[in-house]
């Protein structure tokens, strides 16, 4: 059978580990979006870097194939609402920042919809299996939510959180109403 292949890393670490400005900005972003460690942030930064790298490559490509690839890139970014312009250009892709991707994580959307009081509580609800997307339980806080799935985020029906009078749920709803 052979050994299974070794999977490569899905992120790149910073070139220089001890730059104070970068550390401070990473800390602020981690607190704002409830990230547990820097690796989660680096994964999203690498994903953004790959989108931008592809856009830079496509700017110089004037063939019909380059046009098709640009349309495919726009479709992917629109599907996840990372790119919201109606007539996107490659310059729009180059102007994306890390927060545009972090806003599409399931953890952030659960918090923004008011299903949890904090981003960290949203993460806990997801990891513990209280959140469903399109009726399927999702336990990955970094799951990127597409536009089609945006309205289908809810509590799992057989979860204790689905009860209207659960203490944590009523606290989140009452704080949202104030």
UniProtKB/Swiss-Prot annotation:
The keyword Ribosomal protein applies. One of its GO terms (cellular component) is small ribosomal subunit. Residues 104-166 form the S4 RNA-binding domain. Residues 158-178 are annotated as: Disordered. Keywords: Ribonucleoprotein, Ribosomal protein, RNA-binding, rRNA-binding. One of its GO terms (biological process) is translation. GO terms for molecular function: rRNA binding; structural constituent of ribosome. Pfam families: S4. InterPro entries: Ribosomal_uS4, Ribosomal_uS4_arc, Ribosomal_uS4_CS, Ribosomal_uS4_euk/arc, Ribosomal_uS4_N, S4_RNA-bd, S4_RNA-bd_sf. Part of the 30S ribosomal subunit. Contacts protein S5. The interaction surface between S4 and S5 is involved in control of translational fidelity. Belongs to the universal ribosomal protein uS4 family. One of the primary rRNA binding proteins, it binds directly to 16S rRNA where it nucleates assembly of the body of the 30S subunit. With S5 and S12 plays an important role in translational accuracy. NCBIfam families: PRK04051.1, uS4_arch. This is Small ribosomal subunit protein uS4. It comes from Methanococcus maripaludis (strain C5 / ATCC BAA-1333).
């Amino acid at each position: 059978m052979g050994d299974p292949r070794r999977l490569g890393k899905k992120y790149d670490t910073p070139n220089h580990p001890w730059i104070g400005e970068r550390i401070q900005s990473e800390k602020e972003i981690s607190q704002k979006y409830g990230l547990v460690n820097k690796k989660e942030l680096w994964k999203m930064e690498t994903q953004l870097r790959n989108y931008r790298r592809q856009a830079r490559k496509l700017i110089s490509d004037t063939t019909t194939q380059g046009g098709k690839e640009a349309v495919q890139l726009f479709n992917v970014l629109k599907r996840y609402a990372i790119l919201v312009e109606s007539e996107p250009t490659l310059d729009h892709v180059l102007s994306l920042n890390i927060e545009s991707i972090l806003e599409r994580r399931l953890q952030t959307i659960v918090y923004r919809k008011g299903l949890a009081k904090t981003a960290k509580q949203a993460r806990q609800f997801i990891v513990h299996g209280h959140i469903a997307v399109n009726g399927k339980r999702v336990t990955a806080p970094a799951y990127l939510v597409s536009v089609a799935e945006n309205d289908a985020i809810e509590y799992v029906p057989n979860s204790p959180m689905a009860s209207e009078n659960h203490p944590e749920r009523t606290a989140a709803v009452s704080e949202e109403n104030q």
